[in-house]
């Protein structure tokens, strides 16, 4: 479903260049996209999925060593890239007849013929694919202790993590023709799962 966020409308206009977006589901927004005529298009677009980075695990494994943190970060991002491209490839394997309402009846903004490639709806950054993350606050806690929000160095470090993710997404988007986005994964169940997995590996960390 889509939910209108009245409170955020003013800020959404600033971020989008004038338009107001409604999120897909709870918290996922599509970027501004225009078709070949220059018309802005929102309806009928889609997200091809998300792969989520467990940031607290990288921070814990680095044991306070930022150089090791960034090295591990780069390694995990490389794995994420492969996983995201796999999601795109699997999506492209679909046939219009697999989901006629979406592909052939206009649910995704255009009516494809039975023999057309579904990638016609995805390419040129019409579709998004998301690099998700969980636990940015906990990364700050590992390196700077609790209540680090007012520490300029801590804030700069956490923002640098997001910036590097965004830089990767921009590079991949230009290389592959899909809109790679940075996405604060809104999944309470995955947060709980990651936490349980990390606790099993590292124990309780005060």
Feature-to-residue mapping (PLM):
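Contiguous, well-ordered alpha-helical segments that form the cores/surfaces of helical PPI scaffolds
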Residues: 129-142, 163
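Conserved catalytic cores of very large enzyme subunits
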Residues: 1-125, 146-147, 151-206
